[in-house]
Amino acid sequence: MSKVLAIDYGKKRCGFAISDEDQSIAFPLETVDNKEIYQYIKNITENEDIVKFVIGLPRTNTNDLFNLENEIKLFIKKIKLDYPNLGIFREDERFTSSLAKLLIAKSDLKKTKRENKKLIDKISATIILQSFLKKL
């Protein structure tokens, strides 16, 4: 089988995660600045057998969409143009940042590493992807 690439899209940065070939386990990749996102995706898709994208769906506790969703829709439109043969799926990302912070806090990392926003973003992407993979 092939791999799935997950993206936790943010205003400044995007966290990435990738699945194994069996599409059963999610692994964190990197967090990149938004200005580098398309080049990063290009590099990943050239070096890995990606067949699907999973992009976080930012909802509030009351199930409303965050304003960031408008920006994400533009991002998805560009991804569809650049990768017309790859599937694009959405996954609810409610509480992923909070869960990522909790997981990091329970780790053996030093405090400065635990507060690293880039680490939180890529762990959030991993949580989004693992949630998606459980449904396959």
Q: Model-found features: residue ranges?
A:
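Phosphate- and other anionic-substrate recognition elements at nucleic-acid/protein interfaces
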Residues: 2-7, 11-12, 17-136
